[in-house]
């Protein structure tokens, strides 16, 4: 997988500062409140941001941004799709997505796929929940009953680092990788999370440049910020951090499927910066 072929070189104003320890870093103005998911998949985009970052599970992170308690956050895609027009500006060129098996977002099932009747949904990320509904309902023509985590179910949705831990501990179980299933039916990558900004245009534009620079640094240092061989494989092979034409087409396709099944009222017009 080629890393970030779509992004231009950093502008001079976005140059990183070299810290005493020898590692570069990007300093976001102290007045800007930054949030991110706490998972490994966000590390390349956040590792070189020197400013404080609130790290929250996806659902809570989205709620904090929506409430105005954060100015920018690496939120699940559904937060942007469900919000009124002009609520957010999306930082262009960078996102958390996958071109193939993402490994950390899947359905773990105990009966043949076609016989799934009940699914326990992880409420932590609405994007993954909605993607699971698309794959089971639209692609596989199933109508399972969705239940809360912990209830008896034929399948369960797991995401993020807990999903990685479970999968590594139980390799013999059955897994439906949601990014793989999406690609098989659409031919497109899937975008799980984006940087969403709630600031005036002039502030958002400057911040977007800083976030892109931090992200480029993280992607170029992936081997160094990976603590294990698996983490290196996960960050370089399972994830894609581009937000280019194909990813934007995938976002539009996902939004259209949610409108068709009445999970979204209308296809939103997104603003990239």
Task: Set out the residue ranges of the language-model regions.
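Domain-level signature for soluble enzymes in the chorismate/prephenate branch of the shikimate pathway
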Residues: 1-273
């Amino acid at each position: 997988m080629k890393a970030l072929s779509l992004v231009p070189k950093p502008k001079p104003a976005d140059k990183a500062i070299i810290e005493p320890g020898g590692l570069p870093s990007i300093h976001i103005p102290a007045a800007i409140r930054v949030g991110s998911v706490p998972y490994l998949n966000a590390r390349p985009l956040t590792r070189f941001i020197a400013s404080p970052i609130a790290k929250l599970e996806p659902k809570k992170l989205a709620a904090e941004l929506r409430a105005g308690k954060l100015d920018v956050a690496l939120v699940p895609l559904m937060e942007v799709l469900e919000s009124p027009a002009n609520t957010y500006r999306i930082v262009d060129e960078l996102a958390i997505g996958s071109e193939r098996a993402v490994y950390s977002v899947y359905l773990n099932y105990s009966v043949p796929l076609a016989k799934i009747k009940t699914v326990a949904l992880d409420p932590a990320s609405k994007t993954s929940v909605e993607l699971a509904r698309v794959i089971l309902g639209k692609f596989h023509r199933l109508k399972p009953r969705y239940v809360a985590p912990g209830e008896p179910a034929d399948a369960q949705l797991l995401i993020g680092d807990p999903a990685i831990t479970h999968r590594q501990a139980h390799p013999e179980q059955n897994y439906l990788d949601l990014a793989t299933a999406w690609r098989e039916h659409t031919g497109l990558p899937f975008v799980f999370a984006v940087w969403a900004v709630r600031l005036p245009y002039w502030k958002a534009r400057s911040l977007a440049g800083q976030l892109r620079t931090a992200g480029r640094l993280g992607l170029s240092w992936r081997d160094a910020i990976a603590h294990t061989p698996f983490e290196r494989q996960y960050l370089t092979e399972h994830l894609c951090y581009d937000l280019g034409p194909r990813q934007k087409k995938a976002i539009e396709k996902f939004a259209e499927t949610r409108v068709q099944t009445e999970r979204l009222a209308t296809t939103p017009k997104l603003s990239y910066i």
